[in-house]
UniProtKB/Swiss-Prot annotation:
InterPro entries: Fmt (IPR005794), Formyl_trans_C (IPR005793), Formyl_trans_C_sf (IPR037022), Formyl_transf_N (IPR002376), Formyl_transf_N_sf (IPR036477), Formyl_transferase-like_C_sf (IPR011034), GART_AS (IPR001555), Met-tRNA-FMT_C (IPR044135). This is Methionyl-tRNA formyltransferase. Its EC number is 2.1.2.9. It comes from Vibrio cholerae serotype O1 (strain M66-2). It catalyses: L-methionyl-tRNA(fMet) + (6R)-10-formyltetrahydrofolate = N-formyl-L-methionyl-tRNA(fMet) + (6S)-5,6,7,8-tetrahydrofolate + H(+). Signal peptide: none annotated.
Amino acid sequence: MSQSLRIVFAGTPDFAARHLAALLSSEHEIIAVYTQPDRPAGRGKKLTASPVKTLALEHNVPVYQPENFKSDESKQQLAALNADLMVVVAYGLLLPKVVLDTPKLGCINVHGSILPRWRGAAPIQRSIWAGDSETGVTIMQMDVGLDTGDMLKIATLPIEASDTSASMYDKLAELGPQALLECLQEIAQGTAVAVKQDDALANYAHKLSKEEARINWNDEAAHIERCIRAFNPWPMSHFEVAENSIKVWQARVETRAVTQTPGTIIQADKSGIYVATGQDVLVLESLQIPGKKALPVQDILNARADWFSVGSQLS
């Protein structure tokens, strides 16, 4: 059994809460949790606690929610905890050097990609968007740069042809906690090995935007199909037809030469809506029209065949 560490955990969404749950079941002592301040959520815009806060309170772990770490009070508060280590998972706040240096062993971060391939805010989405064959989690020693710290552990898994950001999120939320526990054991035993990142291999995973999710039919069908999976569940790839914005939940690529203008419907039946692109054909299989849930194309055509007639132009 490895030595028990006094750990401060910092995180906010469900992805982080799954890591906290693993720590709470481990031999380590979780002495405090930091999470984002409660935010308005839902139709009523009621102040809502983060998943991490909810879990911490269920286990009677003290919770701190500073807006930032600029005040002396917030820095002194952290120092008074006398932590061995801070574990950071999708916290959402930048940590200044004084915070990184406060725990005896510094701060480590669980990042949702194989570093240095995708640094930044949207590594899961960008790995699918780019057509990567694998992804994973990297646990790194944090420094003042953005995901630039020395790597302590990498765990990988393949990206399947059907994976969306939603499915990869769930897979990494299972992979990450196990890798974290293994890394903590090595840190506690003094056997952890830090490996520097090769900055020449780094890419920045920019945040997604609704504008980016609008389908450009001039792109290759393979790229559009990857975007559809990368932008699921947010912001959802979409196009316009008959002055309606249509979300695309599922599509496939059919390799064949096309002569029609990109965005032109060349076939529409129960097997799919076939759309010309800059290269090959994109076959739409599941769509969501305004005010409705996502449906197979066959059902969409039963209700709105006039929107998707052969020769119609999608924009």
